[in-house]
From Swiss-Prot:
One of its GO terms (cellular component) is membrane. Belongs to the TMEM104 family. Keywords: Glycoprotein, Membrane, Transmembrane, Transmembrane helix. It comes from Dictyostelium discoideum (Social amoeba). It is a multi-pass membrane protein. Its main location: membrane. The keyword Oxidoreductase does not apply. The chain crosses the membrane at residues 16-36, 39-59, 158-178, 197-217, 234-254, 257-277, 303-323, 363-383, 402-422, 428-448, 476-496. This is Transmembrane protein 104 homolog.
Amino acid sequence: MAGGPSDGSTYSKKTAFVYIFNLIVGVGALALPYGFSKAGLVLGLLFLAAIGFLAFITATWLIEGLSIANFILVNKKEERIIGDDDNENYQKPPTENDSLINSEYSDNKILQSNAEDRNLLEPSGGSSSSDNEQFEIKKRVEVGEMSKMFLGNIGYKVFYGVLIIYLFGDLSIYAATVPTTLANVTGGWGKFTDHTVYYFYLFLFACFVGPFSLFNFQKTKYLQFATLITRNVAFLLMIILSIIFIAQGNGASIKQVPIFEISELASIFGVSIYSFMTHHSIPGFLTPISKKDRLFTLMGLDFILVFIAYGTLCVVSLFAFGAVTNPTCATASTSIHTFIPCQIQSLYIYNFTSYNSKFVSDFLSLFPVFTLSTNYILISITLRNNLLQLITWKQDKISSKVRNVVFSLTSSLIPVGVAFCTRNVSLLVNITGSYAGLGIMFVMPALISFYSNKILIEQYHISNPKKSPFSNKFFYLLILLISVICLILATWKIIITYK
């Protein structure tokens, strides 16, 4: 069901800005330099900017849909109140014995009641403060519930199938990556091999994320800020170390850097979509904001900052290691760190595994641990909220607290079980990011925006004062056309990779 923050707490737009940035910037950012090294500097920047802009467009559509969903919920509540009042205020028609005064008084009450009912039910003008209040985002309506309100049962079921595949796939990837990273950094212990240590770290990871998944977004505020600091330090370190390498005269010249390799477009496609994904959690982190003016601006600034961070990292990586032919950065001895430049790796942190300072190399190697652990909690909360809405079996008989615990543990621990069974998640990454991610990021927001505005006009005869500037046929068709092209590219990439 729709609902606001369960404990009534809110936070500022600055805090929301941190949440959004943390959720967008994940391990996908570390895979971007590798995609740039294949696609080229210009093509990479253009494609990254295009995907970021399209992601912003579809994010505004979900905000728009969220405001319309709140408007509909408010109006349905008012209609129920009016129905109850009609039953309570019903008066028996006057008889011949009633006095004229009583009859006039009764008629006046009935007329007054009818006028009040019309005022409540009648849509107000497009620019009134009443409209703005009705469209205010006060209730958390998850994307899945919006699909049910605007797309009907078929759209609702399709969306939830796509969403659950995406979220469970995402969490399974994270659950396997974090303990793998820890095992690679620390190595085995005596008789315990790296493989055995992996399961120990997986158990610790489950113990960490399980309790946090019981909370809501606002309860993870300090964890989010700590992660933001850690992430920024790691980003700055990689950028600074790359610039130092360039300044020492070891970097690549502009002639050695790939510029525009259109045949490698598929190499950057999947990771670019993955790097801007935040749409599934928009209701969760926007609803608790205390002042919700200029939400489009808030999202836009976040996407711009993310693009600047991504672009800077990718450009310096190309000019630092774009001309290096050494395939790996591994050292002959694990006890002595001698910086060995290598080709841009699948994750950019691996370019610094042999850095002279062991502290720096280990810190960067642990970067996915900091990022993914926090993102895991946020996505787990999102999955729990959607499962609570999807599965309503015995909802009236089981307390909300028990349901919350059950679905929180389900959303956080099942992916851990998947990571326990397998550590090979490469195919899962491609399917999750390319197919399910495409549906959540592009297709569903377009459908929600189109049909929510259609319902608003046809049933309520009113336009949304918080309407997205991109809600028109041109952008709807553009997004759907791009989705088809992206689907073809993704399928081709998977076929040539796993044939």
